[in-house]
């Protein structure tokens, strides 16, 4: 879409956004039709097959979507296929579309390679425009190797989800800083010693608690290290689902912490960059009519995508970076 030739009122801007969304949704529905009907999404030579279960009677546009990542990893195709089938039975939300995708590869890092992000974006878009999912009620969860994926995907794709839950996984090099606006649950058995999963979960629990103390408006979390449980938690991890469904996505948070890992992105909430870079870190907050960039490492140019959901665009605004006023008007 081209920029508006004149300034728009809030009502006119909302009307234009709705018109643009209707047009874009129609384009996406047509673009994704074949993949949706084949139950297999494709991108850059990779294929993400899906199976689903449905429950409840929410109206079109109000349905929730639960994306549940299976375990397995570098165990061979037959094992991963079995884990995929098992994942379809692990959880049953009372309402919504429960989708278990099959990882495109049979590697140890099958859920956090670079192609996964784009494939999940296609899956989410298809279920929004073709199956009536509410974009603010998309949830992510995963078990074992799927939990590894949630540790990684949660922080780097936080703006897509309402909440996420990690079960019995290992974070590898993931960090929780990007979870500022994504409620995050973790469930691990206290006796799940392989790869130090139990200790890693304790470490993440402490990190999330510290982040929550420093920033009480963010880092909502639930951490359960289950006594006497090993890698299999006897279904006690299902307690994550009613906790998750309390939340809706915060699409326009007043504070954003964006940390890029080895899979980079060009956008995150209402921030965008021309090119993502490993280790880049940006913190931006809105205070009244002031946009304040408090941290920007590894970023040459930063784009702020504004909305009346953040501040009153009918009034003057100010943008500050490192204590300097960059824009006022």
What does each of the following model-derived ranges do?
Residues 185-189:
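Short beta-strand/loop motif that positions the catalytic acidic residue
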Residues 136-180:
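Primarily recognizes the serine-hydrolase "nucleophile elbow" in alpha/beta-hydrolase
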Residues 62-130:
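Active-site machinery of serine-nucleophile hydrolases
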Residues 193, 199-292, 296-299:
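C-terminal catalytic histidine-bearing segment of alpha/beta-hydrolase fold enzymes
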Residues 297-315:
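Surface-exposed beta-strand/loop patches in extracellular or lumenal glycoproteins
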Residues 72, 103-104, 190-193, 228-229:
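Acidic beta-to-alpha connecting loop that harbors the catalytic carboxylate
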Residues 1-65, 325:
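A domain-start/cap signature at the N-terminus of enzymes
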Residues 61-65, 94-98, 134-138, 157-163, ...:
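Loop/turn elements at helix/coil->beta-strand transitions in domains of secreted/extracellular proteins
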């Amino acid at each position: 879409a081209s920029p508006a030739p004149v300034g728009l009122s809030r009502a006119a801007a909302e009307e234009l956004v709705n018109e643009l969304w209707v047009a874009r949704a129609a384009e996406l529905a047509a673009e994704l039709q074949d993949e949706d009907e084949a139950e297999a999404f494709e991108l850059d030579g990779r294929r993400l097959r899906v199976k689903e279960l449905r429950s409840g009677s929410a109206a079109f546009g109000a349905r929730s979507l639960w994306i549940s990542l299976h375990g397995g990893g570098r165990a061979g195709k037959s094992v991963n296929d079995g884990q995929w089938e098992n994942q379809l039975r692990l959880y049953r939300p009372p309402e919504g579309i429960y989708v278990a995708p099959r990882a495109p590869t049979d590697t140890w890092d099958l859920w956090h390679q670079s192609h996964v992000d784009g494939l999940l974006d296609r899956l989410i878009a298809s279920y929004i425009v073709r199956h009536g999912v509410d974009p603010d009620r998309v949830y992510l969860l995963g078990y074992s190797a799927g939990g590894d994926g949630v540790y990684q995907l949660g922080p780097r794709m936080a703006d897509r989800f309402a909440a996420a839950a990690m079960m019995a996984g290992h974070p590898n090099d993931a960090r929780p800083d990007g979870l500022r606006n994504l409620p995050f649950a973790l469930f691990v058995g206290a006796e799940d010693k392989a790869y130090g999963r139990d200790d890693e979960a304790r470490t993440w629990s402490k990190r999330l608690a510290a982040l929550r103390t420093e920033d009480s408006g963010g880092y909502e979390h639930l951490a359960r290290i289950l006594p006497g449980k090993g890698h299999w938690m006897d279904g006690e991890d299902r307690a994550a689902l009613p906790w998750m469904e309390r939340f809706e996505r915060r699409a326009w948070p007043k504070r954003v912490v964006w940390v890029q890992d080895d899979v980079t992105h060009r956008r995150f909430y209402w921030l965008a960059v021309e090119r993502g870079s490993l280790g880049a870190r940006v913190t931006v907050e809105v205070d009244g009519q002031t946009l304040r960039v408090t941290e920007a490492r590894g970023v040459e140019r930063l784009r702020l995508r504004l909305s009346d959901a953040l501040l009153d665009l009918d009034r003057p605004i100010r943008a500050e970076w490192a204590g300097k006023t960059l824009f006022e008007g």
